[in-house]
């Protein structure tokens, strides 16, 4: 049998649809795995066999490699008691198989986790006894293949955090009073006290330890054991240091130590030993101070220290001395110095926003830090137990309490700012969420304190973080997205690839550089012209130098070249065609809005793509990919069976109509037929929002740019009725409803069909258990699950006692607490899940049974829904016209969508116009005549690839970012477009058509730009926003209606609205709004009564909020009274409560409902 071929690169995805690309530049490497950021980091944390093999090969056979968990255990071990007679060592972390599958974890609301075990070894050095045991540490959440975690049944993702790297940072500032430059330096560790040196305006060098009071730097040097002579020998070149030495006021090491202790711990009496211990612990003990590998690397790089200190994670005396020397030389204006190992190093201040000084904490490191916190809490417990337990009977398990560790992990995944609910709106939004970089979170910045500099685009972001994709609003610039080709190195710095250039010859060697390495090289752009031999064609080349400066240099000076034009942008931005013609603000909206697109009923790939669609969909993980080559044996909507070339049968289950986190529909559909030959890496089934293996978030619609009777004013959109009738823009949304039956003080709740005071017609769709049947059409107020709850026993009337005597327990009081469809929701029941204690399902304490009902809703496009293109051109559907009223092409084809021309010029997103032209060409097809004398066609032929001379109708095209179709090419192709079957071209050489008005049959006076644009239906649907209330819950204190759709609240009639009413003199309307329609508790019941009985509406009473105001003032000891017309004080107490209850009882309503979430919504 043929050996199966494992696919390594995704470049040649077998069976991929053909896209005709306008790209001129071939990248020497493929885009790396788009989820590697998450997967690789987690593989390092847990130490998977694949990671070990790869890391060992990179490091060399004789180097010991350690996973993230092994690192922490080694750091922690040994845990010794206070007398150092006993010690506990933890090592060899290992995992058992995961306890449940991903689907089970989602179903049962549990974690997708594997049990973690470590080997614990207890040593009693007095008796020489060693006891070793395997200890269970807890269930450790595992990452799924898609880079997510399942926590309590929901899919979450851990976002990578951008933080300032540990290291040494030099800074310059201007003194406000003397206007002289001052310099300072911070030594920032990963863990431990900060050490700061500075030169002040009095020309002394000072030091601050852990942000306490400043003291002369020579005090610290003397405390470290240096004599005055040694200080003079080292720093004699600096007047600053010599004057500081004279003024420091301490003579020897002991005095210096005591002086430091007094500043660090004011109010405590110092001793030499305690002062020595304080200094040692602050900077020279690994338990208290940790530079981390990355910090040591940065310090050595900056100060030019040799490799002797590579493994030392604390500060050394040499570090401190060299830092001070660098600082005084920087202040003196020197440009370079000789480092201790003899190399010449440049002297300069640091830019904290430079990506050489900011690093990523990826998933693995974030979880590792959390486990470290848990283990250090556990360490304290172990120490205490060593001292309290009998030494003979101690075993490792008796010492270890694993609760703090599992609690720390649980807390991180459940509540950390960086553990987020996965955005599953579509495949792209999930992929982008996993590639997100956040500067927020613990140890990062906060929104309020982050200034403009840190949010701004920095030259070092090039090829590392996308300059376009970031949220609008308070988080702008603090949250970014990883660029397409970027990867993260072991230190957490982002690297981007470059091609090596030797004497103007471009090679295919690719090197990855961090931002500070890149600064040392001269780098050309990817679109620099070169010939077929890969040599530059121009003598002088435009290049990028340090700090983002652009210069023109001779080609021999170029060191490297970008690998691809789309290297600087993220995946979502790289999916915007003609990005180079869009204003950056609109491109930002376009990149963000693609993530809000709802998967449609039938996905359709864009006519105009960028070539990124295939890769993004492939790596997002929502499609089914064949792992090995073979032949398809069986295909159905539910599963696909493939017999691979080794004779092994693989079955792939398709996920059908599942609910995502955002309530969109997750459905997979097969692409292959029985008997098909499939290769390794071929797509077997499409996911939501993919078409034939490509990302397909919207629909290709025939667009005309024209105003239409003012109905598309201000970005409104006019749609063809066909979009509704043929379900072109229809999506499916699934809602989940959950109810549980608990034990209450009065007895257990019961899920039943036997509900009091409910007619048989209401129960028609419930089965014998009281649960709605699958397939039932339900609307708001319908019962989904019948449930009754015992009522409190009250004093029985004689009649009830008689009934109780005759029927026994049957007449026991229960109330209806059934789960009903919420207000405004409709749909079809597509799934029911029942969990009960009897079936041994894991349920929360006190819960006997839980039922989940899934209701699907088919939402057609309607007025008020939001549509958008990929260029930030968004709008709301303003009118849906019948097909016959839409403008139509000369051959009778009606337009699908009319966009206003005013939406283009001032927004400067011209990309949408070019997309429309190329969309028309892709739909109509084109054939270029190479012998044509037309100058436009001649100009086009200079750049158009030969394989694009003839393209059939209904083809897919790709115009990659910064390397796509040029204006000249589009202009030439519009002259070469194919006619329709009648032999007529519908669109002229300028991409315009003479449209005819569907209502009158008259042609419009001017030609109109017509073509195909890819339009997305966004998740801002009018169905989810529209809301109305008649009666509903009221706030407990003010008795005013609650606010918002979620609380079934009312509309706020605010201060400005009140003024408007006053201005119009609408006194009675205003009084009604502020009393009986709001918080006049008695009045609103009387009004309801009057409406029911058909009487006149009574006069309003006193609003409840006025009474609250009085009470507030009285609580401030102000004796505020309300006086009647005759001057006597009025009592505002609620005498009307009885009246209220009588009215409520008589009318069968409750208009004084409080804000309890289960307060009944319906007026019976």
Swiss-Prot record:
Q: Which Pfam families match?
A: RNA_pol_Rpb2_1 (PF04563), RNA_pol_Rpb2_2 (PF04561), RNA_pol_Rpb2_3 (PF04565), RNA_pol_Rpb2_45 (PF10385), RNA_pol_Rpb2_6 (PF00562), RNA_pol_Rpb2_7 (PF04560)
User: What EC number(s) does its UniProt record assign?
Assistant: 2.7.7.6
Which top EC class applies here?
transferase
UniProt keyword terms in alphabetical order: DNA-directed RNA polymerase, Nucleotidyltransferase, Transcription, Transferase
Catalytic activity, reaction form: RNA(n) + a ribonucleoside 5'-triphosphate = RNA(n+1) + diphosphate
So which domain of life are we looking at? Bacteria
Q: Where is the composition biased (Basic and acidic residues)?
A: 981-991, 1152-1164
The molecular function GO annotations come to: DNA binding; DNA-directed RNA polymerase activity; ribonucleoside binding
Kindly list the GO CC terms recorded for this protein.
DNA-directed RNA polymerase complex
Q: What does this protein do?
A: DNA-dependent RNA polymerase catalyzes the transcription of DNA into RNA using the four ribonucleoside triphosphates as substrates.
Under the heading PANTHER family, the entry gives: DNA-DIRECTED RNA POLYMERASE I SUBUNIT 2 (PTHR20856)
What name is this protein filed under? DNA-directed RNA polymerase subunit beta
User: Which species does this protein come from?
Assistant: Corynebacterium jeikeium (strain K411)
């Amino acid at each position: 049998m043929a050996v199966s071929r494992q696919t390594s690169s995704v470049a040649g995805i077998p069976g991929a649809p053909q896209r005709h690309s306008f790209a001129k530049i071939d990248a020497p490497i493929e885009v790396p795995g788009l989820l590697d950021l998450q997967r690789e980091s987690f593989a390092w944390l847990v130490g998977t066999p694949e990671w070990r093999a790869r890391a060992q090969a990179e490091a060399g056979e004789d180097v010991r490699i350690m996973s993230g968990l092994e690192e922490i255990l080694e750091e922690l071990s040994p845990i010794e008691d206070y007398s150092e007679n006993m010690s506990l060592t933890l090592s060899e972390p290992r995992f058992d198989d995961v306890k449940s599958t991903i689907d089970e974890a989602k179903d049962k609301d549990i974690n997708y986790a594997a049990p973690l075990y470590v080997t614990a070894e207890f040593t009693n050095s007095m008796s020489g006894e060693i006891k070793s045991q395997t200890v269970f540490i807890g269930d450790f959440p595992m990452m799924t293949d898609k880079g997510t975690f399942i926590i309590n049944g929901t899919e979450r993702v851990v976002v990578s955090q951008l933080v300032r790297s540990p290291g040494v940072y030099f800074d310059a500032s201007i003194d406000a009073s003397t206007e002289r430059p001052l310099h300072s330096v911070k030594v920032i560790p990963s863990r431990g006290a900060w050490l700061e040196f500075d030169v002040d305006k009095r020309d002394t060098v000072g030091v601050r330890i852990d942000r306490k009071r400043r003291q002369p730097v020579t005090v610290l040097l003397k405390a470290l054991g240096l004599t005055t002579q040694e200080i003079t020998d080292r720093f004699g070149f600096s007047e600053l240091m010599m004057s500081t030495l004279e003024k420091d006021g301490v003579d020897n090491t002991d005095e210096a130590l005591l002086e430091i202790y007094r500043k660090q711990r004011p109010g405590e009496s110092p001793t030499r030993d305690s002062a020595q211990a304080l200094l040692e612990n602050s900077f020279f003990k690994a338990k208290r101070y940790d530079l981390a590998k990355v910090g040591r690397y940065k310090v050595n790089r900056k100060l030019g220290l040799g490799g002797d200190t590579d493994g030392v994670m604390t500060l050394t005396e040499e570090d401190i001395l060299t830092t001070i020397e660098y600082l005084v030389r920087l202040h003196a204006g020197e440009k370079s110095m000789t480092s201790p190992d003899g190399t010449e190093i440049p002297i300069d201040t640091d830019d904290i926003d430079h990506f050489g000084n900011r690093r990523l904490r990826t998933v693995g490191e974030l979880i590792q830090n959390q486990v470290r916190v848990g283990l250090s809490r556990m360490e304290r417990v172990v120490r205490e137990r060593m001292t309290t337990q009998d030494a003979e009977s101690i075993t490792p398990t008796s010492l270890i309490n694993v609760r703090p560790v599992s609690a720390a992990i649980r807390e991180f995944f459940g509540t950390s700012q960086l553990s987020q609910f996965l955005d599953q709106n579509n495949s792209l939004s999930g992929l982008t969420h996993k590639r997100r970089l956040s500067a927020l979170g613990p140890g990062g910045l906060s929104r309020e304190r982050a200034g403009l500099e840190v949010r701004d685009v920095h030259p070092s972001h090039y090829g590392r973080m996308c300059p376009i994709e970031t949220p609008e609003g308070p988080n702008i610039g603090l949250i970014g997205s990883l660029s397409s080709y970027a990867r993260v190195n072991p230190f957490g710095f982002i690297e981007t690839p470059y091609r090596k250039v030797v004497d103007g010859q471009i090679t295919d060697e690719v090197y990855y550089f961090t931002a500070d390495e890149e600064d040392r090289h001269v780098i050309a752009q990817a679109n620099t012209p070169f010939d077929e031999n890969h040599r530059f064609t121009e003598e002088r080349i435009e290049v990028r130098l340090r700090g983002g400066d652009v210069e023109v240099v001779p080609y021999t000076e170029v060191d490297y070249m970008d690998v691809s034009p789309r290297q600087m942008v993220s995946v979502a931005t790289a999916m915007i065609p003609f990005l180079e013609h869009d204003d950056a603000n609109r491109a930002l909206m376009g990149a963000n809005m693609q993530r809000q697109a709802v998967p449609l009923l039938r996905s359709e790939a864009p006519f105009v793509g960028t070539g990124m669609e295939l890769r993004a969909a492939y790596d997002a993980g929502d499609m089914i990919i064949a792992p090995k080559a073979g032949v398809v044996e069986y295909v159905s909507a539910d599963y696909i069976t493939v017999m691979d070339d080794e004779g092994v049968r693989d079955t792939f289950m398709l996920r059908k109509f599942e609910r995502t986190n955002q309530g969109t529909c997750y459905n997979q559909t097969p692409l292959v037929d029985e008997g098909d030959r499939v290769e390794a890496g071929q797509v077997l089934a499409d996911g939501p929002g993919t078409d034939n293996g490509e990302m397909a978030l919207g629909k290709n619609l025939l667009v005309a740019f024209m105003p239409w009777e003012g109905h598309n004013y201000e970005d409104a959109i006019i749609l063809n009725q066909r979009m509704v009738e043929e379900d072109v823009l229809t999506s499916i949304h699934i809602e989940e409803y959950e109810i549980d039956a608990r034990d209450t003080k009065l007895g257990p709740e019961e899920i039943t069909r036997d509900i009091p005071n409910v007619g048989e017609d209401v129960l028609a769709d419930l089965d014998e258990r009281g649960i709605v049947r699958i397939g039932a059409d339900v609307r708001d107020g319908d019962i989904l699950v019948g449930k009754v709850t015992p009522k409190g026993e009250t004093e029985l009337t004689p009649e009830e006692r008689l009934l109780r005597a005759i029927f026994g327990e049957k007449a026991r009081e229960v109330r209806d607490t059934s789960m009903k469809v919420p207000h405004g929701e409709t749909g079809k029941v597509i799934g029911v899940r029942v969990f009960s204690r009897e079936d041994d399902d894991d349920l929360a304490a006190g819960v006997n049974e839980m039922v989940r009902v899934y209701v699907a809703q088919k939402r057609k496009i309607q007025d008020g829904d939001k549509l958008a293109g990929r260029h930030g051109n968004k709008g709301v559907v303003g009118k849906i016209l019948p097909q016959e009223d839409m403008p139509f092409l000369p051959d009778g084809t009606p337009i699908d969508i009319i966009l206003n021309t005013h939406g283009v010029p001032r927004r400067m997103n011209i990309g949408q116009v070019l997309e429309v032209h190329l969309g028309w060409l892709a739909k109509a097809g084109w054939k270029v005549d190479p012998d044509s004398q037309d100058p436009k066609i001649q100009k086009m032929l200079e750049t158009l690839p030969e394989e694009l001379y003839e393209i059939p109708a209904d083809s897919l095209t790709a115009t990659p970012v910064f390397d796509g179709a040029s204006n000249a090419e589009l202009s030439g192709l519009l002259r070469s477009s194919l006619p329709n079957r009648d032999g007529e071209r519908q669109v002229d050489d300028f991409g315009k058509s003479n449209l005819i008005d569907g209502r009158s049959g008259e042609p419009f006076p001017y030609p109109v730009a017509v073509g195909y644009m890819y339009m997305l239906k966004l998740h801002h649907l009018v169905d989810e926003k529209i809301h109305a209330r008649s009666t509903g819950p009221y706030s407990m204190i003010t008795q005013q209606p609650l606010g918002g759709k979620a609380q079934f609240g009312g509309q706020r009639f605010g201060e400005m609205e009140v003024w408007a009413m006053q201005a119009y003199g609408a006194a009675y309307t205003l009084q009604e709004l502020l009393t009986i329609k709001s918080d006049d508790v008695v009045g609103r019941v009387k009004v309801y009564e009057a409406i029911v009985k058909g009487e006149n509406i009574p006069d309003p009473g006193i609003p409840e909020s006025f009474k609250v105001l009085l009470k507030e003032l009285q609580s401030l000891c102000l004796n505020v009274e309300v006086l009647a017309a005759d001057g006597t004080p009025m009592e505002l107490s609620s005498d009307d409560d009885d009246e209220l209850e009588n009215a409520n009882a008589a009318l069968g309503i409750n208009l004084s409902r409080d804000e309890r979430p289960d307060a009944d919504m319906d007026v019976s």
